[in-house]
Amino acid sequence: MPNNFFITTPIYYVNDIPHIGHAYTSIATDFIARFKRMSGVNTIFLTGTDEHGQKIQKAAENNSIEPLSLCDKNSAKFRELTEVLNLSNDDFIRTTEKRHIDGAKSLWNKLMDNGDIYLDTYKGWYSVSDETFYNEKDLIKQKDDSFKTVTGG
């Protein structure tokens, strides 16, 4: 069996510029990738940006610019972070790139063809700040009958 290792940072949201948490995660991931390479393991280290979602739409509206313009501006800052930190990533991927879109479509179609994706009904509450669906039992009911997540979203 080949001695291969794949590691990736989270794909960072571009609703804002990078902060210390992004740097920390990137450095930790880079450390592991470098250690694996020094140990003789064929290692692929990827990072990049997620350029979809309500957070990005809202941030673009708040800055009076188009979402893709915000993505272009902030994704460049994340790419710059990889250079400033001297990260050893093999690639930087944006979810708005054609290669990512084509790959995601290909994977989706394969999952559909295999019957791994199906229509169903789901009930829950969506938290934009957490980008997560919650069951009502997982929420905290407020005095005004609204709900909060444990993170406050």
Feature map (PLM): residue ranges:
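N-terminal, positively charged nucleic-acid-binding surface of large information/translation enzymes
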Residues: 1-153
